[in-house]
Amino acid sequence: MSLAITRETLASHISDYAVIYDRDYCLWIETMMQLLREGKFSEIDIPNLLEELDDISGSQRDALESNLEIILMHLLKYLCQPQLRSRSWVLTIFEHRNRLKKAFRRSPSLQKHYQEIFPECYQTAKKMASITTGRLLSDFPEISPFSQEQVLSIDYLPD
């Protein structure tokens, strides 16, 4: 006798898909996708599906902010520590710019969030740069010395 839970056994014994969500997340996803494909919209676990969609949107925004903060931190280090510039810093900047470029291509609406969150991300990046360089927070410009366009430009590095 197999103890494995399958979509069919759960669906036949449990009509409430919210229970599947709590017991086996991957099975719940597969079940919801199948119900959508089959057009069985009345059976969809709407509350949990909405929660998951909200989480996906939040994850996209969190990733954007994290990538932006890393770019800004490395640009600040590059600007303020010219004697320590390294290819690894340039590679990190390139890698995270590329991630943002891909995110914007997949979800153009993230560009609005980028514009809105830029000042806040700069403040976080400034703190990160202060910690990693050992410099005072006041050693860094109060507002970003880099434009939003420069931060995204694949070829831009401060002098």
Model-assigned labels for residue ranges:
Residues 1-159:
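Surface/interface-facing alpha-helical segments and adjacent flexible terminal/loop regions used
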